[in-house]
Structure formats: structure tokens, C-alpha cells
């Protein structure tokens, strides 16, 4: 109740029972707590200094992470890595056994990866291409090239399902070659995991596939030479660079259909090398992309076209604070569309 007038507001309760009412017109100033799952946040006192102290510590930590990243990338540019041999006859056999014809971009990317691996400077290359355009085949070829020089390969993926999918794909492609592929995840028994780790440490496993479990303290490679990161946009900075720090002269191959801005910026600035796979495989239509200003008529026409062919639309907006406003605009433009909102703080 504000001067006798009822007004909708959000009630915030602080430590000690202090209460603060936030007008619905100021909802953009607050957001839902986002932290570790199951973690109970500590409540601060209204007017206290603890929250400001926490923010200052967080800013300081972010600056330190950024500094460490700059140091890491600078060091990788000057450090001496492992120079791989030129292709063996087995490498040629593997590539010849690929059941599809390489696209022009696959050919160029394969050449670029091999040239990187044969240099003394550690490779750090981003392969950017849509789903189904052949990024995994490039990873298989790079992995086998490393194995051919008695190096081990770590493949970091974001989900257990993808780890199993890659395990089956790699095992099937390399079944006729001297290469041991294995995986590690939470569905393996403790005994099975321990055996996998033992074999890895003894060099009996050439390629290990897994989620962030493979960067655990108990995971020790005998001679890690190549790290492949798939769908890197789903990993945090610390997870990816923790494994890079494990061995600074390891070659890095990153695969992504939608690289995060930081990764793309590093590639555009030259801190990382970039290969783009634009050419679709035979019988696959290339994705059509247009960059235009926000235009309601264009948006309406595009959505209506998809609905008319029983398709679905994924509309991405970059701010949670007014994402519902955008949903309202879309609903106004296309009243017959069923629209739902989802974001990371739900």
C-alpha cells in the first residue's frame, strides 16, 4: 500500500527479518539466485557490507582468471610442443575407408589440422561447422594421427550420452586399426573405472572419451598428446583450461557448431586458429543465414512460413530481464503460435 494506493510488488526478506518491497516497475533490478544445484545461499543483512565484499571478491577472481588465460595463451605461443610425423600408410587407409566423399571444407580442414600437428608449436584450432557437416570425422583423423606417434588422446564432451555416442563412433571407425578406444563415466562401476584408469596410466588406452570426469585428479595419462573438446560452448572456462594447464604443450582441437563469443573472439584475433566447414555433405541443404536489423515484418513472415510447414522456431534473445517482453511481441505478431520461454535462471 503506497499512499493509500495498492501496488504490486516483490517482497524481499533479509537476514534478521528486515523487509524490502520492490515495485514491479523495478523488477529488472533483481534476478533469481543462480548457483550450484543443492547449494543453500547465505542471506545478507539489509544495509550491511557483506554483499559488497562478496562482489569485490568475485570481481577480483574474474580478473585473476582472465590474467591466467592471457598468460596461458601467450605461453602456448612460445612453448615447444611435439612435432608429429607425416602421415603413415595406416593414416591414408583410415581416410580412404571413410564411406562418404570429403567436402571441400573437410579437405582444407584436414590439411590445416595436420600442418598444425606437424609443427613444433602446440596446435590450438577451432573447427566451426553445423551439425552433420563432418566435424567428428576430422577429430577421428586427428586422434589417429596422434596415436600413430604413440601419443594418447583425451576427448572431452559435455554429456554422458554424447560420450557413449562418440565411443561407439570412434570404436567403429578404428576397429580395423591398432588403436584402443575407451570411455569413463558414472555408469561404470568403481571397479571398472579403476581398471580404466590403471590401463590409461600404463598406456594401454590410446583414446579416452568422457565428460569433465577425465580431468579428475585421479586421471593420469601416460603420454597425453592431443585434447579434443566437443561442444566447447557447454563447458566453463575453468574446466577447459584446467586440462590445458595439465600439460601446456598438448595439442588442442575444439569442435563447435555455435562457439561462445570468447572462443570466437580468440580465433578472430589470432590467439587460436580457425577452420570453418561451410560446405554441406552431398544431398544436404546448406543452412541459409541472413544478418539484418530487428524487423517485425521479417520476423512475422519467417515464423508464419515455419508454422505453415509444421516446423518449429527457436528465437534467441540475449537478456533475461526483458525476455518476456520479447515473447509478448512475438505473440502479438503471430497470435496463432504457441510460445514458451526458457532461460538459465529458471
What is the predicted function of each stretch?
Residues 80-82, 111, 119-346:
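Inter-lobe coupling/hinge segments of SF2-like helicase ATPases
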Amino acid at each position: 500500500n503506497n499512499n493509500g494506493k495498492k501496488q504490486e510488488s516483490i517482497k524481499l526478506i533479509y537476514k534478521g527479518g528486515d523487509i524490502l518491497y520492490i515495485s514491479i516497475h523495478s523488477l529488472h533490478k533483481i534476478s533469481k539466485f543462480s548457483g550450484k544445484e543443492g547449494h543453500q545461499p547465505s542471506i545478507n543483512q539489509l544495509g550491511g557490507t557483506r554483499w559488497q565484499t562478496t562482489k569485490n571478491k568475485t570481481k577480483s577472481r574474474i580478473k585473476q582468471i582472465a590474467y591466467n588465460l592471457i598468460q596461458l595463451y601467450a605461453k602456448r605461443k612460445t612453448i615447444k610442443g611435439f612435432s608429429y610425423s607425416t602421415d603413415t600408410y595406416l593414416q591414408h587407409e583410415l581416410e580412404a575407408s571413410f564411406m562418404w566423399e570429403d567436402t571441400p571444407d573437410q579437405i582444407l580442414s584436414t590439411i590445416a589440422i595436420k600442418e598444425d600437428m606437424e609443427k613444433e608449436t602446440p596446435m590450438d584450432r577451432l573447427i566451426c561447422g553445423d551439425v552433420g557437416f563432418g566435424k567428428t570425422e576430422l577429430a577421428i583423423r586427428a586422434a589417429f594421427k596422434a596415436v600413430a606417434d604413440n601419443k594418447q588422446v583425451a576427448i572431452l564432451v559435455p554429456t554422458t550420452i554424447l560420450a557413449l555416442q562418440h565411443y561407439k563412433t570412434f570404436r567403429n571407425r578404428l576397429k580395423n586399426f591398432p588403436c584402443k578406444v575407451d570411455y569413463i563415466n558414472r555408469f561404470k562401476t568403481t571397479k571398472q573405472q579403476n581398471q580404466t584408469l590403471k590401463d590409461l596410466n600404463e598406456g594401454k588406452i590410446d583414446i579416452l572419451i568422457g565428460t569433465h570426469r577425465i580431468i579428475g585428479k585421479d586421471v593420469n595419462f601416460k603420454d597425453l598428446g592431443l585434447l579434443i573438446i566437443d561442444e566447447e560452448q557447454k563447458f566453463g572456462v575453468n574446466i577447459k583450461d584446467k586440462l590445458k594447464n595439465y600439460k601446456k604443450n598438448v595439442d588442442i582441437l575444439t569442435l563447435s557448431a555455435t562457439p561462445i563469443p570468447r572462443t570466437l573472439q580468440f580465433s578472430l584475433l589470432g590467439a587460436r586458429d580457425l577452420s570453418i566447414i561451410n560446405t554441406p555433405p552431398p544431398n544436404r541443404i546448406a543452412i541459409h543465414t541472413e544478418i539484418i536489423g530487428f524487423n517485425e515484418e521479417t520476423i512475422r513472415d519467417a515464423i508464419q512460413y515455419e508454422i505453415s510447414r509444421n516446423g518449429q522456431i527457436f528465437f534467441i534473445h540475449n537478456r533475461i530481464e526483458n525476455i518476456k517482453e520479447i515473447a509478448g511481441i512475438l505473440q502479438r505478431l503471430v497470435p496463432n503460435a504457441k510460445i514458451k520461454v526458457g532461460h538459465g535462471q529458471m
